[in-house]
Amino acid sequence: MMGVVLGEGKLPFWIQKEVELKSSVKKGARGMAARRVQEWLQFHGFGLVIDEDFGGVTKKMVQQFQEARGLGTSGMVNAATFQELVAPLLQVLTPISAANHTFSTMVLEYAKAHLAQHPLEVGGQNRGPWVRVYMKGHDGAEFPWCAGFVTFILKQAAETLGMTMPIQGSTSCDSLAAQGKEAGLFMKESTLNGENASIDHLSRASIFFVRRSSTDWTHTGLATAFHRDAFETIEGNTNDEGSREGYEVCSRSRGYNKKDFILL
């Protein structure tokens, strides 16, 4: 397997489950092994119902995927087929050179790497392999994953540079904001207002929060570039409409209204 960043060369157990095939999966298989195959088939555009039952339809989709990738069309998911299915995830786990990078620029490079693979939910709200990777093995409606995505990127950047993260990280927006305050890195929207306000000291990459109240934030992501009236983002669990319950990692432009930041 290609090199990875997290876990000092060894993948955390919840990621191992997503990218390591213990035995071939074929027609008749049930449960998570079948589900993962179905999820990745759907991710790659081979649509089918995700029901954790490897039946005739799943076998047919596997054969179509194998044919498209120049593999033998057995309809059985062996190691070679599985590696092709999970290739986008393996790609984002591949270390990026740390040369000439600060922490904030390293964060930006990893965020771009994830964006290029277009992670998205598969099989329902907050479901699928990408969500489980960002959320330490959890998925489902009760696991919004925007903060998990941010934390995962920060961990990759910190481990690549051999440094401690500026904040601990969390799967909760409110916890991330609290950590930023405790570290003295939190910047309120109010500091951007007024005649003497400036955005020039914002880092190339920072964490942004969508604020509902002074103690409640509903969404978070990475701010990647700043302009006078708007900033650019890479964020998870959102969509082109900017919903806090979206379905993908995407890049957006946002205004500063009701936004706070953690400086990186």
Enumerate the predicted regions with their spans:
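Terminal peptide-recognition signature
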Residues: 62, 146, 150, 205
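N-terminal capping segments
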Residues: 3-8, 12-20, 82-165
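Solvent-exposed, acidic/flexible segments
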Residues: 27-34, 51, 55, 59, ...
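Short acidic, glycine/serine/threonine-rich helix-capping segments at coil-helix boundaries
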Residues: 24-88
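...with weaker cross-activation on analogous glycine-rich loops/strands in unrelated enzymes
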Residues: 57, 101, 105, 160-243
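Residue-level detector of conserved, well-ordered beta-strand and adjacent loop positions
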Residues: 8-13, 26, 86, 112, ...
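Low-complexity, Gly/Ser/Thr/Pro-rich intrinsically disordered linker/tail segments
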Residues: 246-264
